[in-house]
Structures are given as structure tokens and as C-alpha cells.
């Protein structure tokens, strides 16, 4: 730190500050600079600094705006009534950032969000009198302002008041691209994983082309180590919109099903074993995992984040399936994160393997199953999946959908499972259906059923393909439920 009389802030007529951050744009700098979570933390720190300075200058009280709420969930109460619940997120660095009230916002179908309620407690009840998709998000507020919106959850009432599906959003990751460091070479591995923007981003010029640490700057045409392409300058790249429940729900609505939704944190924290098929515990869970995977952000000093199946979620899913609940899980790293995870210790690796093979019914085959994103349904012992139609999913970044650079190839782990789809490029198994007998006498169902996809459902191109696939998956998961 240097204490100097900098002209830029000494002569201004308004409060000002100078921030020197990421000024060298070296490899370590850019590990943070390309991370949306880090950029949010920096922006919030600057906001806090300006706020405190002004409060002290004018001898007044201040409050920092709250962080977005967490543990958001929508649950059916029966007779077309629903409850929304959530939890405030404390800021450990700022006691004034607590929530004093909450704004509940609603969106009907593909319209715009509007305020429908202001409440003082983290809960709200409502009635739905139609069969449209109703989406909700929460804003926390205090004297300092409003938080960023929560993730977007949704519901659809099909007239019975008892939803058949609980859509669980486990895709929370926002991050920089994959990195590697091997001898004299290091950089960002966009072909492995180009990262996940927060909603959307415009920060990248293109993939890195020069990985040699000793490569010197010669001129602007040969800038040396870290040089990158310029083909995506000014291009908006889609990321984690935190709004994929609607897309899954739209496919369920097309098949005639009602649904509720909740965050994976809310789902994992509910350890009460409510009867499967009741309004409070739908018989099918649709788990969205997107590009969720365990990563080591920045220089790794703060540990890992974004594990696809953390212990609490793993245990909750196992308990749910042991009751006779059925599961659809889709994501690019559902097998890699469990069975080929470099961040797992031996104990975690053993528990993850048992969960994947015994509960979900698949084994890891390859971490980059395809590069063209083309998939075909194939014949299997399970009747709903006999059609041999082809579809594709997004493998290159676009303004409309995030890219899946490394989809998993997965194979059945038991004789009661079967491959139901394959990648056209090489014939590797892309999806597995699985039936598992229920041993407990308390279950009203004879088996638990699981469909696992090695790529995210929401990245499938075209509503027609998504609707057809979802209808057949639900026909398999709900034959007698």
C-alpha cells in the first residue's frame, strides 16, 4: 500500500478512490479476473468502502444491502395452495447487511416479473387457479437497498393440487474456465471447460493460443504468453441464468404434469421422510445439475466449491430413492464429479462410488463423451425409449445457451439398468435407465427408478425434442405412481 497525494482523487469535486486490481493481467490475475464470483466480491467490497466513507464523512448511520436469499423452495399444501419459503444469507463481514423485509416477485409463463407481496418473514403462501407456469424469485431488502434476485423457481398446478414432480435446482456454479500448469506451459483450457458466466458475459476475446510461460512480447501481432484469439470480441456468451426450472417445467407441462421446485440446498436440508406421492413429497425428482462440478477457484487458498453431489444431497437422494421415489438427473459432470474427481479424498471417493453405482445405477466411462453434441435414442428393455430419434445439444457458446464442452459418457452399473441413448460420434452411452428393488417394507412402491443423462437436459436444442424426451422419461419413471 502507498499513501500518496494522488491528483485523481485530491482534486475531484466528489468522493473518489483508486483501485489497482488485476493490472498485470498475468495468469494468476486472470484466474480471478475471469471468475464472476470474484468480480462480485470485488464490486461489493468497493461499494462497502464508498458507503462507509460517506457515512463517516457525514456522521450518519449506514446499512449494507443484503446478500441474495438461499434455501428457496416451493411446496404444495394441497387444494391448489402453495408455500414459498427461503432463508436469509448473513454477511459475515458486515453485521448491518441483515434482511428487514422481502419482496416476492411473480412471472406468469414467459412474461415479466412483477411485485406481488412484501413480507417481513421468509415465507409466503398463495393460491393458483390455473394451469399456467408461475415463476417466483425473492429480493431481500433493508435500509441500504435490495439484494440481487434469488434463483428463479416455478410451479404448475394441473388441477389435482398434488404435483407429480419436484424440480430440484442443483446448478449453482459460476466460474472461470478450467486451468492447467504443466512444466513450461500453463493457461486456460477452454476446450475442457470454458467456465460458467453469471447469467451472461462479454469478457472474453477468445480462447488462449500461446501457453508457453517464456514466450516474450514482440509486438501486438505476437504478444507472447497469454495471447488469445479475437473471434468472440463483443459477443455475449450465455451462462447460468439461474432460471432453468422454467425450461424443465415447460417440457413437463407439455406432457401434462404438475410440478413444484426448490433449490438443492432446500431439498437436502429437509430430512423428514414424508410419504412418497403426497402433496409434500412428489413421486419424481428432476435434478438439474448443468455444469456443476467441484472446482478449486483462483489459487486454491479458499478450498473447493460446487461439488455436484455434496454429502447432504447424496444422503437425501438415497433416502428418497429408498422410499420408492424416482429420479431424473442430468448434467455434464454427473459421473466425472463422483467417479473421476481429483479433489476427492479416499473416504469421499468410496462413498461417491457406492452412490453412483448402487443408487443412481451408472458407472463412469469417459469424461468427454462427444464434441459434436449429437445423440440418438436406442432400443432398450425399457419400452418408453424404443423410438430411434436424433437430437442435439449445445457444445459451443451462444447468446441463448451455455456450452457443454465435456459431456459425460456413462454406462449401466447393474443388470437392471440399460443404455437408452448414445452419442452419434462414437456410440458411447449417453444416458442410462435403471430400476432398483426397494428392500424396506414401509415403501408403497416395489422399486425406485432412475434416468441419468451425461449432458444437461436444458441444453437440448428445440422444444419439440425436449418435450418428446421428457414425456418418455416420465412414462418410465411414473408407470404406476
Task: List the model feature ranges, each with a label.
Residues 1-60, 454:
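Active-site-adjacent mobile loop/cap segments within catalytic or ligand-binding domains
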Residues 5-10, 407-410, 428-446:
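Short, surface-exposed beta-strand/loop micro-motifs that present aromatic residues
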Residues 53-96, 144-163:
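Pro/Thr/Ser/Gly-rich low-complexity, intrinsically disordered linker/stalk tracts
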Residues 114-121:
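Short beta-strand segments within Ig-like beta-sandwich modules, predominantly Fibronectin type-III
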Residues 125-146:
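Beta-strand-rich modules
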Residues 152-283, 457, 471, 475-481:
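Aromatic-Pro/Gly-enriched surface loop or interdomain linker
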Residues 160-171, 178-190, 276-344, 444, ...:
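Short alpha-beta junction capping motif
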Residues 292-406, 415-417:
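A glycine-rich, often tryptophan-bearing local segment used as a flexible ligand/cofactor-contacting loop or short
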Amino acid at each position: 500500500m502507498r499513501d500518496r497525494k494522488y491528483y485523481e482523487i485530491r482534486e475531484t469535486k466528489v468522493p473518489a478512490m483508486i483501485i489497482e486490481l488485476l493490472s498485470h493481467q498475468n495468469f494468476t490475475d486472470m484466474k480471478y479476473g475471469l471468475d464472476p464470483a470474484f468480480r462480485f466480491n470485488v464490486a461489493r467490497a468497493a461499494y462497502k468502502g464508498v458507503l462507509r466513507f460517506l457515512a463517516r464523512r457525514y456522521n450518519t448511520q449506514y446499512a449494507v444491502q443484503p446478500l441474495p436469499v438461499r434455501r428457496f423452495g416451493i411446496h404444495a399444501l394441497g387444494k391448489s395452495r402453495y408455500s414459498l419459503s427461503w432463508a436469509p444469507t448473513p454477511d459475515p463481514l458486515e453485521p448491518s447487511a441483515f434482511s428487514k423485509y422481502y419482496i416476492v416477485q411473480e412471472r406468469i409463463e414467459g412474461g415479466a416479473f412483477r411485485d406481488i407481496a412484501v413480507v417481513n418473514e421468509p415465507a409466503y403462501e398463495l393460491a393458483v387457479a390455473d394451469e399456467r407456469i408461475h415463476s417466483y424469485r425473492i429480493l431481500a431488502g433493508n435500509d441500504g437497498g435490495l439484494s440481487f434476485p434469488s434463483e428463479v423457481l416455478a410451479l404448475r398446478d394441473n388441477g389435482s393440487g398434488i404435483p407429480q414432480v419436484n424440480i430440484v435446482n442443483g446448478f449453482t456454479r459460476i466460474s472461470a474456465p478450467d486451468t492447467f500448469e504443466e512444466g513450461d506451459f500453463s493457461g486456460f483450457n477452454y476446450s475442457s471447460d470454458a467456465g460458467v458466466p453469471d447469467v451472461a458475459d462479454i469478457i472474453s476475446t477468445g480462447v488462449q493460443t500461446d501457453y508457453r510461460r517464456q514466450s516474450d512480447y514482440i509486438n501486438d501481432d505476437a504478444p507472447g504468453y497469454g495471447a488469445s484469439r479475437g473471434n468472440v470480441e463483443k459477443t455475449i456468451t450465455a451462462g447460468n441464468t439461474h432460471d432453468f426450472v422454467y425450461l424443465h417445467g415447460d417440457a413437463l407441462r407439455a406432457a401434462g404434469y404438475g410440478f413444484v421446485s426448490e433449490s438443492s440446498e432446500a431439498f437436502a436440508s429437509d430430512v423428514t421422510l414424508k410419504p412418497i406421492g403426497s402433496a409434500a413429497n412428489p413421486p419424481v425428482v428432476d435434478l438439474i445439475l448443468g455444469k456443476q462440478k467441484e472446482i478449486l477457484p483462483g489459487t486454491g487458498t479458499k478450498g473447493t466449491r460446487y461439488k455436484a453431489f455434496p454429502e447432504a444431497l447424496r444422503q437425501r437422494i438415497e433416502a428418497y430413492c429408498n422410499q420408492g421415489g424416482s429420479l431424473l438427473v442430468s448434467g455434464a459432470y454427473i459421473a466425472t464429479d463422483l467417479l473421476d474427481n481429483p479433489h476427492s479424498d479416499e473416504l469421499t471417493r468410496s462413498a461417491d462410488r457406492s452412490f453412483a453405482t448402487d443408487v443412481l445405477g451408472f458407472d463412469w466411462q469417459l469424461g468427454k463423451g462427444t464434441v459434436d453434441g449429437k445423440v440418438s435414442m436406442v432400443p432398450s428393455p425399457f419400452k418408453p425409449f424404443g423410438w430411434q430419434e436424433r437430437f442435439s445439444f449445445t457444445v459451443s457458446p451462444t447468446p441463448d445457451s451455455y456450452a457443454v464442452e465435456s459431456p459425460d459418457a456413462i454406462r449401466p452399473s447393474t443388470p437392471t439398468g440399460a443404455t437408452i441413448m448414445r452419442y452419434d460420434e462414437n456410440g458411447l452411452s449417453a444416458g442410462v435407465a435403471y430400476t432398483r428393488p426397494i428392500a424396506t417394507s414401509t415403501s408403497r412402491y416395489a422399486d425406485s427408478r432412475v434416468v441419468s443423462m451425461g449432458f444437461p437436459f436444458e441444453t437440448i436444442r428445440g422444444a419439440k425434442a425436449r418435450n418428446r424426451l421428457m414425456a418418455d422419461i416420465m412414462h418410465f419413471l411414473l408407470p404406476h405412481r
